Design a protein with these regions (language model features):
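The feature captures the conserved acid-bearing segment of alpha/beta-hydrolase catalytic domains
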Residues: 2-81
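Alpha/beta-hydrolase-fold serine-hydrolase catalytic core, especially in secreted/extracellular enzymes
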Residues: 46-201
Length: 201
């Protein structure tokens, strides 16, 4: 979709780790500082990918001499996007909440009473083990299904390398129903979940 309206320009790209993202801007499109912010995002995305080469697939193109509509030069975005396939169950999640918050992101979720803006959660999965590297919330929910893990075997959750949960989980038909209703996406249906409390510092 072409995003061409004004924006407070306070968003950051950390949550795009598992999303192929392309940004096209006319070099002369200066309203709302769009051209300057696009150039900043090119640097931000490149920096994130340098630190995390398995993530942040991106293409930023500043179309020289072009204004708001770019004379349709941004059509190159379509074949670029067509090369990439969405992965609904990534190994690593970086979830940075903006001021408009959400209650789920891939296989992570939060209860509404624990949802806060401007927070970051980073979780790495390795087989049956989930390591929470960072979580600015008091509690985080890890959702599971049989494509993500072997739910017949124990699951381990650690926080910054220290185990905070180990055990088997129980499949729930109610959670299956809930996650179907949330998105209507069969690749994001979960049958079990673990709610963990983040140790206080």
């Amino acid at each position: 979709a072409a995003m061409m309206a004004g924006h407070p320009n306070d968003s950051t790209p950390e949550s795009l780790r598992n999303t192929a993202f392309t940004l096209h801007m006319g070099a002369n499109d200066s309203a709302y500082n769009r051209n300057k912010v696009a150039a900043q995002w090119e640097k931000l995305l490149a920096g994130l990918q340098e630190k995390d080469p398995q993530g942040y697939t991106h293409l930023v193109k500043i179309h020289e001499g072009k204004g708001h509509w770019m004379d349709r030069e941004d059509r190159v975005a379509v074949p670029w996007m067509a090369k990439h396939t969405r992965n609904p169950l990534p190994q690593r999640i970086v979830w940075k909440q903006d001021d408009v918050t959400h209650n789920r992101f891939y296989w992570l979720a939060v209860n509404n009473d624990n949802r806060r803006g401007r927070t970051t959660t980073i979780v790495q999965r390795d087989g049956q083990t989930f390591n929470i590297e960072r979580c600015d919330l008091q509690k985080i929910i890890i959702r599971l299904n049989d494509d993500l893990c072997n739910l017949n075997k124990p699951i381990t959750v650690s926080y910054q390398g220290n185990n905070i949960f180990r055990g088997k989980v129980t499949r729930s038909s109610e959670l299956i129903r809930q996650t179907i209703l949330e998105r209507g996406d069969y690749t994001s249906v979960f049958s079990a979940e673990i709610t963990v409390t983040i140790p206080s510092k």
